[in-house]
Design a protein with these regions (language model features):
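A structural boundary/capping signal
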Residues: 1-115
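Intrinsically disordered, low-complexity N-terminal regions enriched in serine/proline/glycine
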Residues: 13, 19, 62, 85-88, ...
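Intrinsic low-complexity, glycine/proline- and repeat-rich
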Residues: 111, 312-315
């Protein structure tokens, strides 16, 4: 990857969430780099090495990179000036910068977003299912939640969902879809919101016909596990039969045989649940006990209903 490509990708990832705390209220899309210099310097250092340097600009601490006798500064435009004096700098180690917990957390969030964006590029360039699917217009296949310990795994992009709205579980009018309403009722049982969770689709593009689901699932599996390896969730809730078949990678006769059980798949704990579509009579009723028994606390999974260890199925 070249520097200009990294700069372009990062420019689409900056947000209030990754902005330095004292700058959050001033952050906006017209000044995306505001409050990002330290974590961006760390990421540039991850990919290109060199030195991380610190200067003062208008009495404000500012970080940039020095690579092969070249100054690299992706966030200089936040100062709205071309006259930055880079000469009087001090070298800073990664350890010195990351000792601050807030900086470390923001760095990890931005780095994760970057890695997932690079995987999205691979998905967008994939042509394995070209005659069977329509691509995501936004090339975005991950709904980034506030906490990464739980991932909701859907079947495939719905025609009226986030492939058009750009926001998982919402339509183009930003109205929660019927399946989202049911899912939120279930998440209420464990004190979470849809926005708290990461959301992925087992199939990354929109299948033009359901008969292609199995083939597309096979082709997309490598991308799914690339994403999961970066997110590192503690639990994955797979919605319905198709998503479950894709991730479990073994055959079962009836979906009811696996619902609510915990499977260890490549180090990830997967719990199949009924799809929250309100069309299904089991969308809430069939999942209620599963959610009541699921207690995600301090990033660990405890199955608390039966006062005994639940069997973990390993494949």
């Amino acid at each position: 990857m070249k520097l200009d490509k990294l700069e372009k990708i990062l420019n689409n990832l900056y947000s209030k969430e990754t902005c330095y705390p004292t700058c959050k209220n001033q952050w906006n899309n017209d000044n995306k780099t505001l409050g990002h210099c330290a974590i961006v310097a760390l990421i540039i250092n991850d990919y290109f090495g060199g030195d991380i340097c610190k200067i003062k600009v208008n009495d404000i601490s500012h970080y940039f990179n020095h690579i092969n006798d070249k100054i690299v500064d992706f966030t200089s435009d936040q100062f709205k000036t071309d006259k930055i004096d880079y000469s009087n700098y001090v070298l800073k180690t990664r350890e010195e910068i990351l000792i601050n917990d807030d900086t470390r957390i923001r760095y990890e969030i931005l780095k994760l977003k970057l890695k997932l964006s690079l995987i999205d590029e691979k998905i967008h360039d994939c042509s394995a299912c070209s005659c069977m699917v329509e691509k995501f217009p936004s090339s975005k296949t991950v709904s980034f939640g506030k906490r990464r310990d739980i991932v909701i795994l859907g079947e495939a992009p719905a025609n009226n969902g986030w492939r058009k709205s750009g926001v998982a579980w919402y339509d183009i009018n930003h109205k929660l879809l019927p399946s989202g309403v049911v899912l939120q009722k279930l998440l209420d049982l464990i004190n979470l919101t849809i926005e708290d969770t990461f959301f992925l689709e087992a199939i990354k593009c929109y299948p033009v016909d359901r008969k292609y689901l199995n083939k597309c699932g096979i082709n997309c599996k490598k991308f799914l596990f690339m994403q999961l390896e970066e997110i590192k969730p503690k639990v994955i809730l797979s919605l319905g039969d198709s998503a479950t078949k894709t991730i479990l990678d073994f055959k079962y006769k009836k979906f009811s045989e696996v619902v609510g059980k915990v499977f260890d798949i490549k180090g990830f704990k997967v719990i199949p649940i009924y799809h929250p579509s309100p069309i299904s009579p089991l969308s809430y009723k069939g999942n209620e006990e599963i959610f009541k028994n699921l207690n995600i606390k301090e990033f660990e999974i405890n199955w608390i209903a039966s006062n005994r260890k639940i069997k973990i199925f390993q494949y």
